[in-house]
Amino acid sequence: MLRVNLLILLCFVPFSLNNPLPTLPPDTANAYLRSFLPWWPNNTDFSLRAAPTPSESENSTEAVLLGAEYENGTDSTTGNQEDLDPATLRVQALPDSPLDALSPENAPKSFVSESMNHHDGNFIINFDEMGECPRDCSNDLREALGIVLQDMSHVERYHRICEKYSNASTCVNEDGRCDKDDRGMFEMMTSGLHYMCVEQELAFNATIKCIDDEAGLVQSECDAQCQTKNLFMNWMMRTAFQDTIQQGVNGIVGAATGTNANPLAFLQGAEGAAGGTPTGWADMLATVEQRPPSPQDAQQGFENFRQFTNDLCRIGDCMLDCIRSKFNTRCEGSAGTLLSEVFVRPIAASQNKLSILRPVLGSFMPEQCNYLTNNADLKKHRIDSTMDEELKRMYAEKMAKEIRDRNAQDELLSNLVPLDENGVPLPRALPELKSVDSPLDVSVKTLDQLILDMYSKNETKKAETTKKSYPNTTTVAPKNDDQAANTTAETTKTTSANITHVETTTLGNPKTEEVLSDVSLDTSGNNSTVADSGEGSAEGAGEGTEEDAEYSGSGNESTTEEEYSGSEEVSATDEGHPLAADESNEGLLTGSGEPAEEASGTGNSSVEGSGSGLDSLRSYIETSGEASGGAPGEASGEASGEASGEVSGEEEFSGYSGESPGENESSGEVPLTTTLHELY
């Protein structure tokens, strides 16, 4: 509450006093002002008053400044109005400040032109004097001109200028108040911006970064080559305001160091206050129209204009050549040509529009400025039409390629599987792909299920051995255990006539053991029968031996086929018996022709690796029956000869039969072997 009362009191105190601001003496006021304004003069009659009362001197001063008639109400002696001549007015008794602007309201109309009344800080182009269309649409162009002078990178400046130009162009084209002439003038003045921002936008987008990087070095090299600094320094030395500028610099430096309290005293003039010759800026402006120019001054001014214009045109020509060559060398071979076209295209457009003024301009323009009025001289700074079209095509294709690559990259990135917070791929990222079961996917199957699946697959696949292909082998259908046992027994009974003693060892099938034991008991009875049979019997025995070899080979082949099927096997091996040799080595004998020839002990006996075992047995029985009726004389000789050959052949065959177990071992199974010994 106390704070609120204090605030109300402070608000009403100023209004309760007649003179809240005390009157300060001039010395105090001047000292106060000099603390903030070092250039404020010492001897200035100035005071702060709450309600100032105008005096006669002040009234006369206001009359001088405003250039109007003022009647002094306090003076009763003079009531006549005086006509003031603006040409004789001078600014007196007021300190000058660099912050004071010479406004049209308080300045004499004699030296302020009407066109400068609303200059708005721009003395080059008065946008306010334009028509409605150019004036309203020129705001963006005005901002674009300001952007050129701002401190920023060329990349940012390029984009901002193009943005402003686009807005101004849209305004001119869409505003109904803009007629054809307005649009034509706008296009002529902004043709360089149109070329940079529209026609060759892709080229400038690709080269503006390089231009920004190399601009500082190129500018320094071109300044040294064209001697621009020397030219401007020369013209500064030749100006008529050299002394005035020097005095101003000295005064500012003195004010900064405290040695000079009024650095701008040279603007007021030493004799201005006393009514002498005007030497200050205001005095010079006030009397400029009173001194008509002499012919010598006009001639000198024209010569100065031609010389200055000649130097400017020379520097412009040199800078265009230098910029074009330097930037072409550093930035893709075309940046300098593009920049040169931006600068000279408005000049070329103005030459086409103002072709009538060419002779007039050429009459007083120096030779160095011929490229401003002559298309032939300007052509060296312009881009060739073929190169212009080629640059458009090249950068258009480059942009299209970048767009395709960017789209392909975006498509590739979109197809990548995003990961969750644990780094696991999200399955919803690929909805078009079907999920595939993986043994490593523990989220689908447990470890026990994986192990069971692996062993179940191994059980279904039996251990299979590689079957060797024998081109000359005739396959016989496998027999069951009873048929195999009967066949072995019958063959043993038939061939046991030539064997004195047989020791049988049976491994494996018990049925085969019983049959073989019965065959050994009947051997003695069969020996006497075979001895009385004669020649036919002997020949039959020999032929039977061959047939036995054929049958035993077929039987062995059947046994081999049974081995591959995983069944039990019975093989007989005997060095002197053809049955043992045939049964144990049929795989090798029938696989190639050479072992078969070695197995035939004589030329009359041959072992064939084909035929059925049952057919061989039937043919043997029929042959033995027919041979029983033959001559007994031939039996003894032929039997002995053939028997000896048979024995030797069978021995040779039995030597080769030793390789049969190895062949059986290669099948991956252990065969059951029945061995017969005791040769006769």
From Swiss-Prot:
Glycans are attached at residues 42, 59, 72, 167, 205, 458, 472, 486, 498, 526-527, 556, 604, 640, 644, 664. Disulfide bonds: none annotated. InterPro entries: CPG4 (IPR029153), CPG4-like (IPR053123). Residues 484-500, 633-647, 654-669 have a biased composition (Low complexity). The gene is cpg-4. The lineage of its organism: Eukaryota, Metazoa, Ecdysozoa, Nematoda, Chromadorea. Residues 460-680 are annotated as: Disordered. Keywords: Glycoprotein, Proteoglycan, Signal. Residues 520-530 have a biased composition (Polar residues). It comes from Caenorhabditis briggsae. The keyword Translocase does not apply. Pfam families: CPG4 (PF15481). Residues 1-18 form the signal peptide. PANTHER family: CHONDROITIN PROTEOGLYCAN 4, F18A1.7 PROTEIN-RELATED. This is Chondroitin proteoglycan 4. It comes from the Eukaryota.
